[in-house]
């Protein structure tokens, strides 16, 4: 049974009233809202470290705070430089500095490398202030991503190793394509669940599961291979078809998936990064300068109540 998603609606241009610092803070809040969202199968949340042995909720918060100034620097560059290869080179250099700051804040753990790429591009594009519609920001971010980075390190990253073995394009391919899993999965799902009067927590969990069900997550492929990816995609789909977050059957299916991912040491980190991107673009479209964390007041129990 296919899960039908609404088509992303077209809206008039939205002009920016936020400066680079405010956009960077919104990106930080998106990262914090993602990690605070509970319960997430295999991921760090308020229950614990998920499938990670080197991360925690506090470390994820610290990482988000450490990289926020670099998002602001990217935005400042976008406002002062032409939108061309020079900016691409500058933003890439800032991104590598952000990775160093992240590693220092987390004692060497990779908390947000993918998010630095994803949200860095989106903050840079949004800082132009031309149009804050999600599709327009994603289009500009994709244009920038596709420009060559002359200083790109020659060492293979985990994502590049996975791409070579499985053909999955990962965060780089997502950006090149204009963030389709954000525009056509995350955002429409979040809107649809709000229209169904879901709690904000459940709406965000629905968005995450829909992304997990479709994304060729290179974080999953690196840890669990093709079999692990199939488990994640089927498990997320099964949870949605069972009723999703907000239903006893759906939450029990999420629990089963969570337990399976912990056993296999699999964490869908790529999907988590795209959920954060979803929350960031959603806030911009809604004209919000803050992303509320509803996790403490809207806890999902995995159907145990």
What residues fall within each predicted segment?
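Short, hydrophobic/aliphatic alpha-helical segments
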Residues: 91-107, 250-264, 282
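Long, hydrophobic/aromatic-enriched structural stretches that serve as scaffold segments
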Residues: 71-126
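Phosphate-rich cofactor/ligand-interacting catalytic cores and adjacent structured alpha/beta frameworks
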Residues: 1-82, 88-89, 126-259, 263, ...
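Short glycine/serine- and small hydrophobic-enriched flexible loop segments
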Residues: 120-128, 279-286
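Short, electropositive, low-hydrophobicity segments enriched in small/polar residues
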Residues: 118, 124, 182, 273-274
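Short, structured motif recognition centered on aromatic/hydrophobic residues
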Residues: 118, 205-212, 274-281
């Amino acid at each position: 049974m296919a899960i039908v998603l609404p088509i992303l609606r077209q809206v008039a241009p939205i002009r920016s009233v936020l400066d680079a610092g405010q956009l960077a803070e919104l990106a930080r809040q998106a990262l914090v809202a993602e990690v605070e969202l509970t319960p997430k199968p295999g991921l760090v949340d308020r229950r614990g470290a998920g499938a990670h042995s080197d991360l925690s909720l506090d470390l994820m918060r610290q990482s988000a705070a450490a990289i926020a100034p670099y998002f602001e620097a990217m935005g400042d560059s976008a406002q002062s430089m032409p939108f061309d290869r020079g900016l691409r080179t500058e933003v890439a250099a800032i991104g590598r500095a952000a990775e160093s700051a992240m590693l220092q804040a987390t004692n060497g753990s990779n908390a947000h490398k993918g998010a630095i790429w994803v949200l860095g591009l989106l903050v840079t594009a949004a800082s132009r202030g031309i149009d804050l519609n999600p599709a327009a920001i994603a289009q500009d971010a994709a244009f920038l991503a596709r420009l060559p980075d002359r200083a790109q390190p020659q060492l293979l990253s985990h994502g590049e190793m996975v791409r070579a073995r499985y053909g999955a394009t990962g965060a780089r391919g997502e950006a090149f394509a204009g963030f389709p899993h954000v525009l056509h999965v995350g955002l429409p799902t979040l809107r649809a669940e709000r229209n169904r009067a879901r709690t904000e927590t459940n709406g965000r969990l629905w968005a995450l599961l829909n992304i997990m069900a479709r994304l060729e997550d290179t974080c999953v492929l690196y840890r669990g291979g093709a079999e692990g990816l199939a488990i994640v995609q089927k498990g997320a789909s099964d949870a949605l078809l069972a009723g999703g977050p907000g239903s006893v059957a759906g939450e029990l299916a999420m629990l089963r998936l969570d337990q399976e991912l912990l056993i296999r040491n699999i964490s869908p980190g790529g999907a988590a990064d795209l959920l954060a991107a979803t929350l960031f673009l959603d806030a911009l479209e809604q004209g919000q300068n803050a992303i509320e964390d509803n996790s403490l007041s809207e806890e999902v129990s995995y159907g145990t109540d």
